[in-house]
Amino acid sequence: MAIKLIVGLANPGAEYAATRHNAGAWYVDLLAERLRAPLREEPKFFGYTSRITLEGEDVRLLVPTTFMNLSGKAVGTMASFYRIQPDEILVAHDELDLPPGVAKFKLGGGHGGHNGLKDIISKLGNNPNFHRLRVGIGHPGDKNKVVGFVLGKPPVSEQKLIDEAIDEAARCTELWFKEGLAKATSRLHTFKAQ
């Protein structure tokens, strides 16, 4: 099983670009940069897209331009157009339950209250069995503060940790294609930015 679509979740527009909720898009932006495959807006897929080759595999990159809670529209449209199955999709998203500086791969599971994941599961026919890259952003400590927290910008010290985890996640994504998911997961899950 090869990954054919890598998605980075975000809200569109300059006012959201540096917010924690856009951590998934930061990862896809970095992959596109590392592999010299600039993202271009493609309205028919409701997002910015690019095409990369990893170890001979053709992979699409996607950052939806819909708002977060409508991410499934972009993912579902692209998956349907290219006949990509849920287990061939990797969705990168911000994760409240991991601290900044940590990122983890995961297959399947619920949406954990994440509206982007919720909409993707729905638009994939209620199938949650896609891969996720959970990018740790930490938790404000009070569930009533979550919305303001994810839509806020991390302080410089936290941003540095998040960026380092995303950099390691990009390297581990390439390792996944070279040596398999088990090896990539083992390496990523032992990483913690200091």
Swiss-Prot record:
Catalytic activity: an N-acyl-L-alpha-aminoacyl-tRNA + H2O = an N-acyl-L-amino acid + a tRNA + H(+)
Annotated site, Stabilizes the basic form of H active site to accept a proton, chain positions: D94
Disulfide bond annotation, renumbered to this chain: none
SUPFAM superfamilies with a match to the protein in the record: Peptidyl-tRNA hydrolase-like
Active-site residues annotated for this sequence: H21
Superkingdom, natural source: Bacteria
EC number: 3.1.1.29
Site for Discriminates between blocked and unblocked aminoacyl-tRNA, residues: N11
PROSITE patterns: PEPT_TRNA_HYDROL_1, PEPT_TRNA_HYDROL_2
Family membership noted in the UniProt record: Belongs to the PTH family.
Function: Hydrolyzes ribosome-free peptidyl-tRNAs (with 1 or more amino acids incorporated), which drop off the ribosome during protein synthesis, or as a result of ribosome stalling.
Quaternary structure annotation from Swiss-Prot or TrEMBL: Monomer.
Descriptive protein name: Peptidyl-tRNA hydrolase
Gene source species: Salmonella dublin (strain CT_02021853)
Lineage: Bacteria, Pseudomonadati, Pseudomonadota, Gammaproteobacteria, Enterobacterales
